[in-house]
């Protein structure tokens, strides 16, 4: 499974990769990096944060909503998009944009007691079972 992890928080990336899961994953900190990579590579899963700047937030920076629009406008292919942002309004906007375009989206605000890798595996297994019908 190839995963693109879009988040400016290095601690989340460390938590995500701590168990050395055998997936190819790549972290980017800014929307511009993500659009560049998505224009060149394909991913099975894209994990999206919304706010892409450590406080103080600069509203003029591209955010997860901008990336969701890019994904739709450029018809980026992936099996699952995970929205892990704690920003409820931003996550709701991304969810609306992506689901209206037909993407399989998992709304999963990242709380430290959740294991995002386990959630991703369950979603992958569910899709594999559905594809095999």
What is each residue range found by the language model?
Residues 1-133:
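Catalytic phosphate/metal-binding cores of nucleic-acid and nucleotide-processing enzymes, i.e., regions
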């Amino acid at each position: 499974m190839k995963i693109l992890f879009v988040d400016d928080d290095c601690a989340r990336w460390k938590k995500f990769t701590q168990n050395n899961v055998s997936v190819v994953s790549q972290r980017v900190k800014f929307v511009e990096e993500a659009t560049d990579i998505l224009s060149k590579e394909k991913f099975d899963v894209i994990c999206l944060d919304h706010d892409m700047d450590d406080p103080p937030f600069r509203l003029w920076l591209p955010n997860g909503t901008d990336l969701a629009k890019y994904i739709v406008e450029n018809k980026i292919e992936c099996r699952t998009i995970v929205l892990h942002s704690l920003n409820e309004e931003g996550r709701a906007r991304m969810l609306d944009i992506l689901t209206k375009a037909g993407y399989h989206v998992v709304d999963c605000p990242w709380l430290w007691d959740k294991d995002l890798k386990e959630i991703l595996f369950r979603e992958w297994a569910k899709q594999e079972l559905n594809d095999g019908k």
